[in-house]
Amino acid sequence: MRKIIHVDMDCFFAAVEMRDNPALRDIPIAIGGSRERRGVISTANYPARKFGVRSAMPTGMALKLCPHLTLLPGRFDAYKEASNHIREIFSRYTSRIEPLSLDEAYLDVTDSVHCHGSATLIAQEIRQTIFNELQLTASAGVAPVKFLAKIASDMNKPNGQFVITPAEVPAFLQTLPLAKIPGVGKVSAAKLEAIGLRTCGDVQKCDLVILLKRFGKFGRILWERSQGIDERDVNSERLRKSVGVERTMAEDIHHWSECEAIIERLYPELERRLAKVKPDLLIARQGVKLKFDDFQQTTQEHVWPRLNKADLIATARKTWDERRGGRGVRLVGLHVTLLDPQMERQLVLGL
């Protein structure tokens, strides 16, 4: 049985700012773009979250909820430096590390001899070491598979951890809401609940064939996760090549204005996700995806050095006009392709 730890730093960007400027610790702060430039919030500290300020929220809305919010532009070199230090701490316990972004990672400690091989004690020691050396707090989840470790890391935030032992997995899954499973969004969760599927326990009673017929590949993943099955390895060689965000509508859309409104809502989340893995926002390409009511889909992208909403909207409009052919649209997606590390190095050297 594997021993997987998911470590997630607590409001990472904001935590670095509060560490470096103690005057910020007890006041609401957020990292993000200005209201005048229609910026969005990247992250907020817990005092700000009490007012409802959240990641990916437009800055203007955040300031309405919390007029005395202190807005900071972000110091991405400082965040990257802290992230590198955290990753070095991970490497003291295992070489099997899969970074997901600057502030979270999976660790496979199945074969680790530290702490007598106890994943629970390793997670505690890692969190304590991070605090001792960086004065930052982390939360952790421990489980025999990746998706449960990720869910567990959110159970006792901030500055806590939650352990799901192999023996506890069946009982934990019985009441686990499907919406908690990574990859099950609000629209999917609503559709599942509409047919009586709210928890993993509900899905366990379903025939896999029926789920496959109704939901395709997603149905299989849903069934496997509800049984506690997740065979994905912690991939130390993982190189993230793209970042994306998409939305499946409850009803098909037929007017460009509806599509544009969805892009306006998706863009802040794309910006937030990209900032977590690429703080300088440098990219190779950006593009859009449309899926039609006949389940055919099309993508269009082109070279662009930085994330740019106006260009994405223009690309989407061109795709809408040229490829829709009168069909309804059931899904809208935005994505960016990241720079190859070798190409990025060449670009930096050429500056």
Swiss-Prot record:
Active-site residue numbers: 104
Sequence ranges assigned to domain UmuC in this UniProt record: 4-185
GO cellular component: cytosol
Keyword Transmembrane assigned: no
Keyword entries, A-Z: Cytoplasm, DNA damage, DNA repair, DNA replication, DNA-binding, DNA-directed DNA polymerase, Magnesium, Metal-binding, Mutator protein, Nucleotidyltransferase, Transferase
Textual note on the cofactor: Binds 2 magnesium ions per subunit.
Pfam families reported in the protein's UniProt record: IMS, IMS_C, IMS_HHH_1
SUPFAM superfamilies: DNA/RNA polymerases, Lesion bypass DNA polymerase (Y-family), little finger domain
Subcellular location: Cytoplasm
EC number: 2.7.7.7
GO molecular function: damaged DNA binding; DNA-directed DNA polymerase activity; magnesium ion binding
Ranges that cross the membrane: none
Catalytic EC class: transferase
GO-annotated biological processes: DNA-templated DNA replication; error-prone translesion synthesis; SOS response
Cofactor(s) this protein requires: Mg(2+)
Annotated site, Substrate discrimination, chain positions: 13
Tree of life domain: Bacteria
Reactions catalysed: DNA(n) + a 2'-deoxyribonucleoside 5'-triphosphate = DNA(n+1) + diphosphate
Binding-site positions, Mg(2+): 8, 103
Family the entry assigns: Belongs to the DNA polymerase type-Y family.
Subunit architecture: Monomer.
Role noted for this protein: Poorly processive, error-prone DNA polymerase involved in untargeted mutagenesis. Copies undamaged DNA at stalled replication forks, which arise in vivo from mismatched or misaligned primer ends. These misaligned primers can be extended by PolIV. Exhibits no 3'-5' exonuclease (proofreading) activity. May be involved in translesional synthesis, in conjunction with the beta clamp from PolIII.
PANTHER family: DNA POLYMERASE KAPPA, DNA REPAIR POLYMERASE UMUC / TRANSFERASE FAMILY MEMBER
Name of the protein in question: DNA polymerase IV
Gene assigned in the entry: dinB
